[in-house]
Amino acid sequence: MLEIESPTSLCFRTNTTCNALLRELQKIWVDIGESDAEKDRMLMELEKECLEIYRRKVDEAANSKAQLHQSLVSIEAEIASLLAALGVFNSHSPMKAKEGSKSLKEKLAAVRPMLEDLRLQKDERMKQFVDIKAQIEKMSGEISGYSDQLNKTMVGSLALDEQDLTLRKLNEYQTHLRSLQKEKSDRLNKVLDYVNEVHTLCGVLGVDFGQTVSEVHPSLHRTDHEQSTNISDDTLDGLHHMIHKLKTERSVRFQKLKDVAGSLFELWNLMDTSQEERTKFASVSYVVRSSESDITEPNILSSETIEQVSAEVDCFNKLKASRMKELVMKRRTELENLCRLAHIEADTSTSLEKSTALIDSGLVDPSELLTNIELHINKIKEEAHSRKEIIDRIDRWLSACEEENWLEEYNQDETRYSAGRGGHVNLKHAERARITVNKIPSMVDNLIKKTLLWEDETRKSFLYDGVRLVSILEDYKLTRKQQEEEKRRYRDQKKMQDLLIKRRESIYGSKPSPRRSNSVRKTNGYNGDASVPPTPRRNSAGATNNDIMTTPRSYSSHRQNGYFKEVRRLSTAPLNFVAIPKEDSVSTYTSVCGSEPDSPLYN
């Protein structure tokens, strides 16, 4: 194997070879007989040719060096550009290690692998950018609805820059892509929600769903998947406006159906329509009772349904015209019942007799008369609602008066403490009755205050069967006060009577008195033997206004009142609080007045 020689040995061997060749050439020249001048000339040419060869070789070597250096510089520049584009900053790269190399070829050999590797990295990074950019452009087009102007604006802002292929830039693209994916998902869900709402509204209104959504965009009702669902702003706005339009139509139809159904229900009630006939429109009844937003039944607000209900109303109106007189009588009776229950005097201008006479004479249109009665019924219902609290208080007051009457009867029974059947029940009843009776004054005062407050609010008198309630209550308070005075006078008289009897007995001795009857009064509901006392009997509410203070009245639909009868009794004669036989009463009165000769007062 040949060894590479050093420059010194190479120069020595070259000189030796040249000297040998020169000596051989001189020998040839001698043999030829060349002159010295010719020899010098040929030697000069030979030397010149050698110099030219050396110079050419040196130039070639210099050019080769320059090319190698230029290649190295170009590679280094490309590597630097790739590193900057990829965002790679490696302090241990081969470019740092090349400074220790001895030749340009070694330097080139060191950086070329790095260049190839960076080029591969750039190609791979470019593929990632191109793929993400394509997805971004596609989603941007879907969101913008493939609008050229908007699409160019969004894509232009994402123009690919090959000088910036860093991971930071790639992450920005990926973040943008994820943002578009989320926006697409949100828009798609919103479109689906809108479409579902449109489907529900179309079902309720009986409108063709496919035709409705196709007016917004054909892709919303495609069954072939040739085109994806459009999620652009125009589609969302179109669906929003379509929903608003359908809801407006639903409101109009709902109100129309409600009005028509209301008329139908009134006619049903007037005509006493059977439940079987009403069942055909059960769904309509449900709609009227529901709120507009709760209606989801298909075709319930369709034009056909509304027309069917309207046709039914027209049919009943024709039937109503033929039965108008009967309906007027029926509604007038209903009005009188309402007035009786509310203790309000009914309008006499539409009484049964007058209504019948007006209809038979033809002076009044039955429809107008019926409308007038209907208005009066509604007015009575409203007034009865406002009077309800006071009427309830009146009922409680009357119940307390019944308990008071029963307690009076019970206290007059001398056998009330006997151990007979039902005695303990009557004792408990009496205890409850005393508690209730003690509350009567406060009940009356509160009722008066409540009534006056009602009169202030309504600016009219509270009439109870035609008589002002406050006047009734004031009369009751006055009568009750007279009753209390009568009780007090009786107690004083009884005390004086007992005192005189005792004095008489102490002077003249006691004498037997007639034996009293053990019979017990059982009027006004008291039953000494029954376990539960019956309710005091009352008359019905048919009394006239002139009998208000002399005749019992009805104060409720379930009970009859005996209070006004009691008021009259209290106002004409004192109550008999203790049952005293006639003989004892006469003797006692004579004793008190001193009419007997044996009496101390007589003496």
UniProtKB/Swiss-Prot annotation:
GO terms for molecular function: microtubule binding. Keywords: Coiled coil, Cytoplasm, Cytoskeleton, Microtubule, Nucleus, Phosphoprotein. It is found in: Nucleus; Cytoplasm; Cytoplasm, Cytoskeleton, Spindle pole. The keyword Mitochondrion does not apply. The modification Phosphoserine is found at S513, S599. Pfam families: MAP65_ASE1 (PF03999). Residues 515-526, 537-559 have a biased composition (Polar residues). GO terms for biological process: microtubule cytoskeleton organization. Its main location: nucleus. Residues 48-79, 131-186, 468-502 form a coiled coil. InterPro entries: MAP65_Ase1_PRC1. The keyword tRNA processing does not apply. Residues 501-559 are annotated as: Disordered. The record marks A419, A430 as: Microtubule binding. GO terms for cellular component: cytoplasm; microtubule; nucleus; spindle pole. Forms dimer. Binds to microtubules (MT). Belongs to the MAP65/ASE1 family. This is 65-kDa microtubule-associated protein 7. It comes from Arabidopsis thaliana.
